[in-house]
Amino acid sequence: MNFPLFTGCATALITPFLPDGRLDEPALRRLLAMQTAAKMDALVLLGTTGEPCTLSMDERERIIEIGLECTGGSIPVIVGTGSNDTRRAIEYARQAQRLGAAGQLSVTPYYNKTTQSGLIRHYHAILDACPLPMILYNVPGRTGMGLSADTAAALSRHPSVVGLKEASGNSTLTGEILEKTRRELPIYCGNDDQILPMMAQGSCGAISVVSNILPDKTRALTRACLERRMDDAQALQLELMPLIRALFLQVSPIPVKAALAMMGLIHDELRLPLVQMDEPYRSRLKQALLDARLLS
């Protein structure tokens, strides 16, 4: 049995920047305070939502340090360590372990795609070099390749593999993974619009974008699912759907950073090649925030 790092809801936190492009440490601390106040079950730093591909090793270190300082050990802090260079992924994993992270989230290699056997060798190489507990991350829409159910089952036998963030949007694949791993590999929903159906199917939680905006309600949705209060879960999922749709009008994290800026929590700054949200999408996002009573 692979024991999960958490059950419930983890926020895939954004990385705030100043207008001059530097890391906005005060804003990061505000966001972390908002998450801890909502009693989130875990936090993911430097995941896709955190723009890790445009951060230096020093910036990564500072973000992890602040995350661990602000949470004070109250919840697991999981660090995104994925790379399409296995050697770099090992460096990221060792950094996260050295600083005290509870675990790592490792996306399948992108662009220079590999085979399923290559995926197994990639992940085993990382874990042989650094056994920091790992949540695998399957998001073929971004990486261009997917993790098969057989590969997930093979990797689940490694003692340091403690979960899978499944963001393919393929419920059949989720079912196959649950079947082939005998439900012993914890699976986390990686798509906010599918939290209820995936948790009803057997997932143990979610790694969420919308929880950057509404951490309390997103966590309440996952708790309702875990406690099998499906009427409550359905109501919460439906309540969140308009905002979820708005947060994916353009490529994430562009909309979620625009939303947080409208709420006065951060500057609306991203690092190229990401750019600020276009019209008419920005107006639609603002209306969704108004409808959710997050703006006045």
Predicted feature residues:
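Alpha-helical structural signal in soluble globular domains
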Residues: 38, 62, 66-71, 95, ...
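Charged, low-complexity surface patches
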Residues: 24, 85, 187, 249, ...
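A general structural signal for well-ordered alpha-helical segments in protein cores
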Residues: 28, 60, 64, 89, ...
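Short secondary-structure transition/capping segments
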Residues: 55-58, 91, 116-119, 147-149, ...
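C-terminal alpha-helical cap/extension of soluble enzyme domains
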Residues: 5-15, 34, 38-40, 49, ...
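Alpha-helix N-capping/helix-start residues
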Residues: 19, 25, 57, 149, ...
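Catalytic alpha/beta core domains of metabolic enzymes, predominantly
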Residues: 128, 140-248
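Active-site beta->alpha loop and helix N-cap motifs at the rims of alpha/beta catalytic domains
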Residues: 3-11, 16-144
